[in-house]
């Protein structure tokens, strides 16, 4: 099965899993997705993720979703840069997400990182998504 936007598909699976109050969702594995999930885990938006091998010897990522008092921790996860329209930002011109309460994830020449880390390192890049 091919995807037009595998990152957008990952965000949809997380969003749909939280709407159904699932404990975890399964996502096809890739290094780029692992890097994004690592940032979401470090920032406290998901509990954890781990690599799972399915019966067809395909590797997938099992994401354990996080809730606070029954409500999903992620209120909004939105894809910014899409395959048909890439969005880039310089280090100086990047606004904060929800006045600093949210998070933007960027793909930079030094790897995938949060907007805060990119600002500290004075690096620009492609804005993958914003999370609040």
Which residues does each predicted region cover?
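Core subunits and conserved enzymes of cellular information-processing
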Residues: 1-132
């Amino acid at each position: 099965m091919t995807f037009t936007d595998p990152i957008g598909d990952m965000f949809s699976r997380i969003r749909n899993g939280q709407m159904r109050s699932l404990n975890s969702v399964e996502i096809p594995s890739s290094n780029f997705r692992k890097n994004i999930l690592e940032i979401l885990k470090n920032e406290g938006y998901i509990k954890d993720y781990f690599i799972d091998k399915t019966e067809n010897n395909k590797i997938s990522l099992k994401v354990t979703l996080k809730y606070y008092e029954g409500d999903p921790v992620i209120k909004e996860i939105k894809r910014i840069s899409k395959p048909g329209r890439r969005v880039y930002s310089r280090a100086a011109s990047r606004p904060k997400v929800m006045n600093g309460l949210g998070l933007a994830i960027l793909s930079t020449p030094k790897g995938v990182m949060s907007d805060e880390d990119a600002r500290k390192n004075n690096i620009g890049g492609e804005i993958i998504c914003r999370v609040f």
